[in-house]
C-alpha cells in the first residue's frame, strides 16, 4: 500500500471497544491482587499457541493449501531486555478481526464468572486456563499487551490494551507475519525477570516441555570476533601507518624476509571486537516419551524420564507403557518406585503422583479422580486426546471420560503387579514397600478385590521364613479342610506361640499369620478366597475337621464340664458372655475368644490406640468375650473337682478370676485393672514361698476390695496351689 495513504487509514480505522463487564472485572482482579506464581502466564500463552497450531493442522488435513502462507508449525519466544518486552509468536490459525473483538474482550467465556468466583473463594491463579480465560493471565506480568494476528481469510490486525477497561483494534500495514499470532508483552518494571534467558527456560521446562510443536527461544548475545584493523578502529590504523612511515628508512629490501615482515605486520593488525548475534535454542527437544513406540525406548530412557518426573535418585522398580484406542484415546506411562515415600499415607499429602496432560498440554498433577488412593505411590503421566483443554476440577469429577481412564489405569496397574509377582526377588522388594497399599485396596476396591487378593503374601505355620500367596495355601489344604484359617497379632513369634493355633498345628492344618494392623481391616472385606471362607482362629464357633468319634467325645466333655462352666460364668459375671468347652486348645488351660462379628484382641488393641477413637463403638464391639476351657488340662480338671466339692470355696473364686485374667493377657487383650491382677500374683508368690500375710507390707500399700479378691487361707491353700500346679 502507498506510504501516503497509510497514515490516514491508520487514524481512521482505529476502533476502540469496551471490555465486557465480567472480563473487565476479571482483569481488575488479576492486576490488583498479589499472586505468587505469576509464571503461569507463559504456560497459558504457549498453550493457546499450541491450540492455534492444532487447528491449522486439522484444517490442512482436508485442505493442504491452508499451509501455503507458512509451512512450518512452530512457536517462538523473543525477549528484548532493552525494550523490556517478551514476544510469543506462533504460526497457528490466526484470528480474523471478528475473532479478535469477540475472543479478546467483548464476549465473556462461560468460565469467566466461574473463575472469578473460584478465585475469590481462594482458588489458585494457575487454574485460569481451565476456565478458558488463560489469555488474560498475560496481565499478571504485563502493563500493556499487543496482539498482531493474521488469518488466511482476513487482513492482518493489531489488538492492543493496557487493561484500562478498553482495547483497540486496527489494521496492520507493517511487516506481514504470514499467518498466525504474535503476542507482545510490555512487562511491568518489577517483572523484568521474564526477559532473562534462564528464567524463560525454567518456566518452559516446568510447564510446557511436552508441547507437540517446537518452542524456540531467540536470545540476542555477544561474542568476540577477530577483525582487521581496517575494518575496525581507523584511528589506530592511522597511528600504525604514521609509525610505519617514521620507521621506513630502517626496512631492508631482502625478498623473502620482506614477505615475512609483511605477514607479521598483517597479524599484528588484527583486533578482537564484540559483535551481536541471535542465538536460537529449541527448548522442548525432548519429545514426549509416552508418544513413542515402547519397543523403541530403552530402559535407560525410561529411567531418565522417571527420575526427571519424580525427582527420585533411584531407578524405578517396574514400568507400564500403554495406549488405549477406540471410542476413547489416551496414552499412559506408569512407574512403580523402588521404595515407598515416608509420608505415603499422610492426609495432607497430595493424593497421587500422576500428571494429567491433554494433547501434550500439562493440565494438573494432583487430580484425585485419576487413580484411587491405594495406588497413590504410582508415578507417571496420562495424556488424553478426548478431554477438553479447559477442563476444571468440578468438570473432572463428573467426567465420564475420566472414569473410563481411571478404570483402565487401575486394570493396567494390577496387570503390572501380577507381572512383577512372577519375578520373586523384585516382588519381594515391591511387597516390603507397598503391601499396605494392596491391603488398603482390598478394603476399598470391591471390583478388584479378587485380583488384589492374588497379590497378597503372608507367613504361615508351614512356610518358615518365606511368605506365600493364598493360592499356595489353598493348594496345600487337606482334603477334609473346608476353610482358610488365619490369626491376627503383633508379631510372627507371638501368633506362632498363641494358644489359638495349638490344635490346628497338632492336626497339621496350616494357619496364616497376619501381623500388620491393616490386615484386620483387610480381612473384614476379604471374606473368602477361591470359594473357601477365611476363618479367624481367635473367634467363637471354630469348625475343625473331625470324625464322628471325635464329635462324640467332644459332646461327652461338654456334658462333663457343664457345671464348671456355669460356676465360672457366675463368678466372672458381666466380665464374660459365656464359658464353653474348647476344641482348639492342647497345652493351654483356657483362652478368650470373641464373637464372630466383634473385634479380635488385636483389633481392640489397634482401636484403643487411635487418638480420635469413638468410645461408643468401643463399648459394643469389645463387649462379647467368651472363655473357653481345655478339658484335658490338669488345672481345669482339678478346678472342676474342687468346684463340684464346694462351689462356694473362696479359693475356687480366686483361681477362676486369676485364670480369666491370665487368659486375657495370653489371648492378646489388656487388663482394665492390672494392679489388682499384679497383687493376686504377688499373693500367690507369697503362698509359694510360705510367707504369712502379716509379714508383708505390700497389703498396706494397696489392699483391693474384699469382694474383688477373696482372702486365701494359709497352709490349706498352699497345698491346694500345689495340686493345681
UniProtKB/Swiss-Prot annotation:
Record has Nucleotide-binding as a keyword: yes
Listed InterPro entries: HATPase_C_sf, Heat_shock_protein_90_CS, HSP90_C, Hsp90_fam, Hsp90_N, Ribosomal_Su5_D2-typ_SF
Acidic residues biased stretches: 228-242, 705-716
Effect of residue 94 to D: In slou45; absence of thick filaments leading to loss of filamentous organization of myofibrils
Chief site of localization: other
Disordered: region residues: 228-273, 697-725
Tissue specificity comment: Strongly expressed in the early embryos within the somitic slow muscle progenitors, the adaxial cells that lie on either side of the notochord but not the notochord. Also expressed during the early differentiation of fast fibers. Detected in developing cardiac muscles and pectoral fin primordia. Not detected in mature muscle fibers.
Alphabetical keyword list: ATP-binding, Chaperone, Cytoplasm, Myogenesis, Nucleotide-binding, Stress response
Biased composition (Basic and acidic residues): 243-253
Record text on activity regulation: In the resting state, through the dimerization of its C-terminal domain, HSP90 forms a homodimer which is defined as the open conformation. Upon ATP-binding, the N-terminal domain undergoes significant conformational changes and comes in contact to form an active closed conformation. After HSP90 finishes its chaperoning tasks of assisting the proper folding, stabilization and activation of client proteins under the active state, ATP molecule is hydrolyzed to ADP which then dissociates from HSP90 and directs the protein back to the resting state.
Role according to the record: Molecular chaperone that promotes the maturation, structural maintenance and proper regulation of specific target proteins involved for instance in cell cycle control and signal transduction. Undergoes a functional cycle that is linked to its ATPase activity which is essential for its chaperone activity. This cycle probably induces conformational changes in the client proteins, thereby causing their activation. Interacts dynamically with various co-chaperones that modulate its substrate recognition, ATPase cycle and chaperone function.
Family: Belongs to the heat shock protein 90 family.
UniProt subunit comment: Homodimer. Interacts with unc45b and myosin.
UniProt remark on domains: The TPR repeat-binding motif mediates interaction with TPR repeat-containing proteins.
Name of the protein described by the UniProt record: Heat shock protein HSP 90-alpha 1
Provenance organism: Danio rerio
